[in-house]
A protein has these predicted regions:
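A structural signal for multi-pass alpha-helical bundles of membrane permease subunits
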Residues: 1-166
Length: 166
């Protein structure tokens, strides 16, 4: 029908499907890499006691205060020297670095809301720390992890400045 003619032209003549696939790969890759790093970091900041914990906790969001345009020239220079311009790997690095602070911040708030008594019950039941994280904390955190995953996907999908520069 005439109604969908423009869509057929865009996908057929302008290779739009390939661009959509690339955007999907980059966005999903960013989500996966960000969650791999954000979950242990947020758990550490929320639960473990270490020197500089408060400073680290507050500085996570301070990083997010810098506008992206300030980072473009230094990153462009570094990525040119490393040969990461015009590559999916380069975008994954930049997108992960820009979404990691907000992912850690969101997850640490949720991890703090989980009662410590559940972890203590896991220790009594014979679980080690990895067992506690994988069998108690992560299943209880699935709503927060899904929210963070959707938010990171949205940020990566809508980001244009870095994809234009790199």
């Amino acid at each position: 029908p005439e109604l969908f003619k423009s869509y057929f032209i865009v996908f057929k003549d302008y290779n739009f499907g390939r661009y959509m696939l690339t955007s999907t790969i980059v966005s999903l890759g960013t989500v996966i890499i960000t969650l791999i790093f954000a979950i242990p970091a947020a758990y550490a900041v929320a639960r473990l006691n270490f020197f500089g914990k408060n400073f680290l906790s507050t500085s996570i969001l301070i990083i997010y205060l810098f506008p992206a345009i300030v980072l473009v020239i230094p990153l462009y220079t570094i990525f040119s020297q490393l040969g990461l311009r015009n590559s999916i790997e380069g975008l994954l690095i930049v997108y992960t670095a820009t979404t990691l602070p907000v992912a850690i911040y969101m997850l640490q708030g949720y991890f703090k809301s989980i009662p410590k008594e559940l972890e203590e019950a896991g220790i009594i039941d014979g679980q080690n720390w990895l067992g506690i994280i994988f069998k108690i904390i992560l299943p209880l955190s699935l709503p927060a992890i899904s929210s963070v995953a959707l938010y990171v996907f949205m940020i990566a999908w809508n980001e244009f400045l870095f994809s234009l520069m790199f």
